[in-house]
A protein has these predicted regions:
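Extended, highly charged alpha-helical segments
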Residues: 17, 21, 25-66
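Glycine-rich, often acidic, oxyanion-interacting loops/wings at catalytic, nucleic-acid
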Residues: 45-156, 285, 290-291
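Phosphate-backbone recognition surface of nucleic-acid-processing proteins
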Residues: 152-253, 290
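Low-complexity, acidic/Ser/Thr- and charged residue-rich accessory regions of DNA metabolism proteins
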Residues: 202-206, 241-295
């Protein structure tokens, strides 16, 4: 069938199709998927980490734009080297010279100053949101009765080594704070980390992960998986990773780290919902006594 085929699309056609589906559902066929709508409070709570991530992406774009404008003239200002500090950037910009020793064009300096003003504004907004997030988690750790379920679970996750405030808050606001999972398969599927088999007759192959779930959680879990291997080397999941890769190359490691991300997500779900500490995991030094309280 041609992919460019033009299909009829009218309200009448849609209503007839919907009525047939409803009739099949009434007869007991499984033709609809249940959509779990988050409560209004959970929707609002997700805005903070999402906005924080969006601002960080915007900051990166502005940084790259400033560096590109200056690099074209032979000027290198690296934010990782401390050049993007508010106290020194404008001073270094005024003293910068082109590759041939001549002053920077006035129009270029003006545009860079405009970009710098945007950078400072975004940086201030990031600090404000990060402080709000830290205050919310601090209140949850102190047992504030007004703390939301997502905040309390995020505070619990941060007790584990390798799990920071940002990652814990995203996990709980996107998943653990309001969603209900019946089994580990649902947990892996919601992040799109489960496999996609393709079989026919006696033949079959694995097509990789489905990538059909929450992209934010999927990306975060891969990052957390690498951190988990670093800060939790004696955990069962980390040992499994080392046993699997052996002398594997980068491709084998990439495939194995996705499996670690899936396993870790399930373990964190068991931890926040059932109090089961991941096998071999350790707590941060200031929370070493939490293992007995959670178990």
């Amino acid at each position: 069938m041609s992919r460019r085929k033009r299909n009829v699309k009218t309200d009448t056609v849609d209503v007839r199709k919907l009525s047939r589906l409803l009739a099949r559902e009434h007869e007991g066929e499984d033709v609809f998927r249940v959509v779990r709508v988050p409560p209004e409070e959970a929707e609002v709570e997700r805005l903070l980490p999402r906005q924080l991530k969006a601002l960080k992406k915007q900051r990166t774009r502005i940084t790259n734009r400033i560096q590109a404008r200056l690099f074209a003239e032979g000027v290198v200002l690296d934010p990782r080297g401390g050049s993007f500090r508010a106290q020194t950037f404008l001073k270094e910009l005024s003293q910068a010279l082109r590759w041939d020793g001549s002053p920077l064009p006035a129009g270029l300096v003006y545009m860079v100053r405009q970009d710098w003003a945007q950078y400072c504004l975004v940086e201030e907004q990031i600090r404000d949101l990060a402080q709000r997030q830290r205050r919310a988690l601090r209140r949850a750790r102190e047992g504030d009765p007004e703390a939301t379920p997502a905040q309390r679970k995020a505070a619990l996750l941060t007790e584990l080594r390798g799990i920071g405030d940002v990652g814990a808050y995203v996990l709980t606001t996107e998943l653990f704070g309001w969603r209900v999972f019946n089994n580990r398969k649902e947990v892996g599927a919601i992040a799109g980390l489960t496999g996609t088999p393709s079989t026919s007759g006696n033949g079959g192959r694995e097509q990789g992960i489905s990538k059909a779930g929450n992209a934010r959680v999927r990306t975060l879990m891969v990052e957390l998986a690498w951190l988990w291997l670093r800060y939790q080397p004696e955990s069962r999941t980390s040992k499994w990773f080392r046993d699997q890769i052996g002398k594997a190359g980068s491709r084998g490691k990439r495939r194995a780290i996705v499996a670690v991300a899936r396993k870790l997500l399930v373990e964190l779900w068991h931890f926040v919902e059932h109090g089961v500490v991941p096998d071999g995991a350790t707590f941060k030094p200031e929370n070493a006594g939490l293992a007995q309280r959670v178990a």
